[in-house]
Amino acid sequence: MTLRHISVLKEEAISFLNINPNGVYVDATLGQGGHTLSILNHLQDGFLYSFDQDLKACSDIQKKLNPNWPIEIIHSNFSNLKLELAKRNVFQLDGILFDLGISSCQIDDSQRGFSYLHNAPLDMRFDNRQKLTAQEIVNFYSFEKLKNIFHIYGEEKKAALIAKQIIKNRPLKTSYDLVAITDMFYKYHKGHSAKKIFQALRIEVNQELEVLKQALSQSLELLKKDGSIVVISFHSLEDRIVKHFFKKNSVFEFPKKLPIMSVDYPQPALRIITKKPCIPSEVEMKNNPRSISAKLRAAVKNI
């Protein structure tokens, strides 16, 4: 079944961005443009830069935009934030939004290999310009490397067994070739047998966790004082990175016996405004099942 992509936690994200109508903003994950259009609706003399590494997403949204709207779409990975903005003489932002979820359109594209529900070549690249594909990983990575990817990125308990069977059954070309292997171990398991393996491969293909760390660091440098950063994540690995980054930059740690009074502490870079992650309402989860795992964290630049 094909689902229309619905932006998750859209109202909450816009609220936490606290948009200045004349400010400069980045939507780091354009996708199908839901959050981008919401930000645009709050701008007057401001400007928005929307990033996406998926050329199709950029092209699809570009066709729908009024040429007079204050927006530029940038076909690039969000790990290139500073580089791409510097090309445009932009060195400070009033706010930045990350929606880390894969779009429904990408999942439902039967030729891109993101879904275990479609028989497609094992590709999984967000950006077709890059060389590494999921097919190369399953056919050429060593047992140890496959096992580690499945264990770390997929949190898969049977990582070693699945990796061993993949090597035994090489070459694998399609998503159904891979599903046939995971079904050996989870035939009667609740949920799909390949879910964690597909997640792990997608993360490895696109280096999702590494580029997220890079983009968060760059965001902190780019934000003005009182600028907002909002991140929506969809699995524990992403959320853990965001949580750690916010915490690390919102406190100062000194040796316990150092004679410094609390009033002398330098101000931390960030002030966290979501003490606990914001999650979708029951109504949103019912209307959009893909929102169920979403968590939103937000912070404001202090200095």
Curated annotation (Swiss-Prot):
SUPFAM superfamilies: Putative methyltransferase TM0872, insert domain (SSF81799), S-adenosyl-L-methionine-dependent methyltransferases (SSF53335)
Keyword Hydrolase attached: no
Gene3D superfamilies in the cross-refs: Putative methyltransferase TM0872, insert domain, Vaccinia Virus protein VP39
Principal location: cytoplasm
Pfam family, one: Methyltransf_5
HAMAP family in alphabetical order: 16SrRNA_methyltr_H (MF_01007)
Annotated protein name in UniProt: Ribosomal RNA small subunit methyltransferase H
Encoding gene, per UniProt annotation: rsmH
